[in-house]
Amino acid sequence: MKTCLIFFLYTTILQYYFHFSVSSLSTPLLLHLSHSLSTSKHSSSPLHLLKSSSSRSSARFRRHHHKQQQQQLSLPISSGSDYLISLSVGSSSSAVSLYLDTGSDLVWFPCRPFTCILCESKPLPPSPPSSLSSSATTVSCSSPSCSAAHSSLPSSDLCAISNCPLDFIETGDCNTSSYPCPPFYYAYGDGSLVAKLYSDSLSLPSVSVSNFTFGCAHTTLAEPIGVAGFGRGRLSLPAQLAVHSPHLGNSFSYCLVSHSFDSDRVRRPSPLILGRFVDKKEKRVGTTDDHDDGDDEKKKKNEFVFTEMLENPKHPYFYSVSLQGISIGKRNIPAPAMLRRIDKNGGGGVVVDSGTTFTMLPAKFYNSVVEEFDSRVGRVHERADRVEPSSGMSPCYYLNQTVKVPALVLHFAGNRSSVTLPRRNYFYEFMDGGDGKEEKRKIGCLMLMNGGDESELRGGTGAILGNYQQQGFEVVYDLLNRRVGFAKRKCASLWDSLK
């Protein structure tokens, strides 16, 4: 009887501890995102920063549609390259910095010894390759996580590769460390890696999650920095958190501080909020129960605008939404059919992406937007053709006076689900010249990009909403209700208020 009582008390304490440390958290967890430029001296000119960012955006988008990769069932766009998150894995107190990427579904980082092929032109990692802690364990070949890492390959095949005896495979007895998950290959749009799957504890502020699964890579191609995948797959960070704590894993949001490549602004932390839910008093914009007695415009500006996530059979980890059109001033330009829906082959839709800098649109739709924009701005300001090739952006203009820029509104699917972008999110102004060759002049560029002809995009993503256009918004990924929301925020102030 005494033994039973002790055992009961022991298990109760364990349950209480686990419940307290993971499941009972009713408040969101706040993490900070740092821009990759914040770790550098950031002495590059605006033109150089624009060119490098536009080149990365184009590569991340276009290489996803490369014909040589069409045979692959599921391929992330590319690893993210703008915002870094710091995580602590295992018993070691040291943290590892990873790119936050909503376009992929795996958490991985470089492990010692580490070799990166073709990384000479890549940014230096903010932290050295990690060593596995003594508490790390290999994931067995029969684990569902192993199958997920191997693109849903059956566990029987994986265990056969791991030399698990046939009778063990038939009886399901391969679930030991003696038969680990085989190394897996993971490809991005412009890089790849080979890694092994491990399990260890994940430490976040106020919470520790046991049995967290991650990839440990000893060799990569053009990928010197690890990635925290926040996509919709089984191995993503939100999905694994949801297993331990639905509150933390069923919703997350970030609020990217508006920086315009300014060296001071780019060093401000941007809040990443795990377990962020819309307050019950804060009504969803565009629903039938949205009946305000007063016309409080300020309150409405702070409300979330939601649009439903689209299901993608080919890329199930993407946060794809339906774009109905874009307004330039008072003119609404309808979006092509491929941006409104996803076809049976997984083509189309707009991916809300944290890892691509600039928004990419299909050529015909992009040209219609540019034509309307240019008809309003170009009739007053001289076109800066010389700057466009060196910036990667178009159109650009010389600004000799105060420029009147038409409003730009994104119309997503859903009743009143429209998002008005702040001017700085789509029109970048900077000084160029003054080097003795050209006089110093003020220039402004439209910050949208041509993603290529629709014929080239078939079977792949139709468009991408880049992180530059997401600045100054809290973007919430409501995984429980399968929707994405946008609300205007002063992100730097939000960080200060939530700390």
From Swiss-Prot:
InterPro entries: Aspartic_peptidase_AS, Pepsin-like_plant, PEPTIDASE_A1, Peptidase_aspartic_dom_sf, Plant_Aspart_Prot_A1, TAXi_C, TAXi_N. Transmembrane segments: none annotated. It is an enzyme of class 3 (hydrolase). One of its GO terms (molecular function) is aspartic-type endopeptidase activity. Residues 83-487 form the Peptidase A1 domain. Glycans are attached at residues 175, 211, 400, 415. CDD domains: pepsin_A_like_plant. Its EC number is 3.4.23.-. Keywords: Aspartyl protease, Disulfide bond, Glycoprotein, Hydrolase, Protease, Signal. The active site is at residues 101, 353. Pfam families: TAXi_C, TAXi_N. Disulfide bonds join 111-119, 396-445. It comes from the Eukaryota. One of its GO terms (cellular component) is plant-type cell wall. One of its GO terms (biological process) is proteolysis. Residues 1-26 form the signal peptide. Belongs to the peptidase A1 family. This is Probable aspartyl protease At4g16563.
